[in-house]
UniProtKB/Swiss-Prot annotation:
Keywords for this protein: Aminotransferase, Mitochondrion, Transferase, Transit peptide
Major enzyme class: transferase
Gene3D superfamilies per UniProt: Aminomethyltransferase beta-barrel domains (3.30.70.1400), Aminomethyltransferase fragment (4.10.1250.10), Probable tRNA modification gtpase trme, domain 1 (3.30.1360.120)
InterPro entries documented for this protein: GCS_T (IPR006223), GCST_C (IPR013977), GCV_T_N (IPR006222), GcvT/YgfZ/DmdA (IPR028896), GcvT/YgfZ_C (IPR029043), TrmE/GcvT_dom1 (IPR027266)
Compartment(s) of residence: Mitochondrion
Record-stated family: Belongs to the GcvT family.
Coiled-coil ranges (or none): none
Name recorded for this polypeptide: Aminomethyltransferase, mitochondrial
């Protein structure tokens, strides 16, 4: 039985997380409430107690009956099922689809083995991040990628603009936006055992970053071993008409241990895993190098360039960026976005981009950007919350160790 003090703390933190998430969601909502889009699982969420809020023009569950703290911990101990169908999946096809995409992203897509994928970044002419995206090389003439819901319109407009110019020069590439499919994320230590009950494919030989077509519970799916929690897990693309039945099947196979989980816990999980949230930790004026994503710039791409903003990005790789994304452990109230970061002399050196109370670590964590030279682990800082300074220390990320199922 939980002690009263911890329970009260948990309830307080849950309310603060929910309030903060709702503020973020409200800022990103691109439609009035009456015009909100609904995923194929909307009625299923409502029937299961989902608290629906607007996000990027969609009505999405922020949480269910469990608190955000309890949902976060349950994902790490058992598992979570998320509806992420608001995100945009699309396919690029044609013999030139890879050369085309490599003009827009920093990754070495040509170097991927068929059936594997990677996180990459769409960049602009100044090297800033238009969006981060998970890209899968299905075959040499078929690329599947997923972009963020809040960036959908600008991403698609950006891709379409460059595709028209590319095709005008004789390039062979076409695209399809998969609005006919839903996307579910099954995450946590029970993700693989639960999914294995529903497919004949041997998931023990299916590793982090890999992609395949397969039947799950008899439904035709795209399966990627990936996620946004730091846990082992899968993202499953399924035709809309089967989404609810597939969700029910996965929950039933877990015997109640895998639970429906909303955006509140998803944000806590990704923060504990040290992962960027576009619009907070990654934006059009921030380069992949500043964001700590240098690893996403393929070796061949560093040598050849050829992508938007390459001159800026390659110079930062060579000389170092002016600012860097780092993690923090802090005292006092949880730091929130735009909280000022000062050095021990009281000089401003950066700002927080994401922060909150870690349900798993039981302490305040945050990430933000500081001027280079202030980024080493162990550096002491002050973080201003409501104008008052609180002690913090630069900390390596992830805050909670990741558990990706990688190839031996």
């Amino acid at each position: 039985m939980r002690g009263g003090g911890l329970w009260q703390l948990g309830q307080s933190v849950t309310r603060r997380l929910a309030q903060a998430e709702k503020k973020v969601i409200a800022r990103r909502c691109f439609a009035s409430e009456a015009d909100l889009k609904k995923t194929a699982l909307y009625d299923f969420h409502v029937a299961n107690g989902g608290k629906m809020v607007p996000f990027a023009g969609w009505s999405m569950p922020i949480q269910y009956k469990d608190s955000i703290m309890d949902s976060t911990i349950n994902c790490r101990e058992n598992g979570s099922l998320f509806d992420v169908a608001h995100m945009c999946g699309l396919s690029l096809k044609g013999k030139d689809c890879i050369p085309f995409l490599e003009k827009l992203v920093v990754g070495d897509i040509a170097g991927l083995a068929p059936g594997t994928g990677t996180l990459s970044v769409l960049t602009n002419e100044k090297g800033g991040a238009i969006d981060d995206t998970v890209i899968t090389k299905v075959t040499d003439d078929h690329i599947y990628l997923v972009v963020n819901a809040g960036c959908r319109e600008k991403d698609l407009a950006h891709i379409e603009e460059h595709m028209k110019a590319f095709k005008a020069k004789g390039g062979d590439v076409s695209w399809h936006i998969h609005d006919e499919r839903s996307l579910l994320a099954l995450q946590g230590p029970l993700a693989a055992p639960v999914l294995q009950h529903l497919t004949k494919e041997d998931l023990s030989k299916f590793y982090f970053g890999q992609f395949t077509f397969l039947d799950i519970n008899g439904f035709p799916c795209y399966l990627t071993r990936t996620g946004y929690t730091g846990e082992d897990g899968f993202e499953i693309s399924v035709p809309n008409e089967y989404a609810v039945d597939l969700a029910k099947a996965m929950l039933e196979k877990s015997e109640g241990k895998v639970r429906l989980t909303g955006r509140g816990a998803r944000d806590s999980l990704r923060l504990e895993a040290g992962l960027c949230l576009y619009g907070n930790d990654l934006e059009q004026h921030i380069t992949p190098i500043e964001a700590g994503l240098t690893w996403a710039v393929g070796k061949r791409r560093r040598a050849e360039g050829g992508f938007l903003g390459a001159e800026v990005i390659l110079k930062q790789i060579a000389d170092g960026p002016p600012q860097r994304r780092v993690g923090f452990i802090s005292s006092g109230p949880p730091a929130r976005g735009h909280s000022e970061i000062q050095n021990e002399k009281g000089e401003s050196i950066g700002e927080i981009t994401s922060g909150g109370f870690s349900p798993c670590l039981k302490k305040n964590i945050a990430m933000g950007y500081v001027k280079s030279g202030n980024h080493k682990a162990g550096t002491k800082v002050n973080i201003l919350v409501r104008g008052k300074p609180y002690e913090g220390v630069v900390t390596k990320m992830p805050f909670v160790p990741t558990k990706y199922y990688k190839s031996p």
